Amino acid sequence: MNFSAILLLALGLAMDATAVAAARGLSVPAIRARHVLLVAGFFGGAQALMPVIGWLLGARIGPRVQAWDHWIAFVLLAFIGGKMLWEARGDGGDDGGEGETTADPFALSAMFVLAIATSIDALAVGITLPMLNAPFAISVVTIGVVTALLSAAGLFAGRRFGALLGKRLDLAGGVVLIGLGFKILLEHLVLS
C-alpha cells in the first residue's frame, strides 16, 4: 500500500470526526485554542490509537468488532445527539438567559465518547493493515494527523456556519450527530 492509498484511507476515516467537530463548532459563540486542541487531540488521537488497538488484538476480536461496530457508533452518536437536542429545547427557559445551554459541548467526557464513536471503524482498519502490506507506523501517524487537521477545520467551518445562522444551532448539531449515527448504521446494514 503506497502513501497515496494511506492518505485516501486517512481521509475516509476522518470524515465522521470532521462532521462531529463541525457540529461542535455550531454550539459555541467563539472558538478558543482549548476547543481546537480538544477536538484535534481527541479525534486525531482516537483515530491513531484505534488502529494500534486493532492491530494488537488482531484476528481474535476482528469478526466481533465488525459485526457490532456500526451499532456501537450509532448508539453513542444518537445518545450525544439526543442530549444536544434535549439541552437545546431548554434554551431561553427558566433562567431568562440568552439561550445558552448549561452543558459544555467540549466536556472531556463528551469529547471522549464522540472520539470513540467516530473512530470505531479505525479499529477494524487496524486489524486489516498488516493484510494490506501497509507500513504500520506511517499509516497510524497519517490517520491521526489527517483526522486532527480536518477535525480542527471542521470545528471552524461549523462555527462560521453557526455565526451566519444564529444561536439555535444546537438543534442542528444534535440532528447532525443523530444523522451521522444513522448513516453509519445504514452503510453497514444495507451496503455490507
Swiss-Prot record:
It is found in: Cell inner membrane. It is a multi-pass membrane protein. Pfam families: Mntp. One of its GO terms (cellular component) is plasma membrane. GO terms for molecular function: manganese ion transmembrane transporter activity. The chain crosses the membrane at residues 3-23, 36-56, 65-85, 112-132, 136-156, 171-191. It comes from the Bacteria. Signal peptide: none annotated. InterPro entries: Mntp/YtaF (IPR003810), Put_MntP (IPR022929). Keywords: Cell inner membrane, Cell membrane, Ion transport, Manganese, Membrane, Transmembrane, Transmembrane helix, Transport. Probably functions as a manganese efflux pump. Belongs to the MntP (TC 9.B.29) family. This is Putative manganese efflux pump MntP. It comes from Sorangium cellulosum (strain So ce56). The gene is mntP.
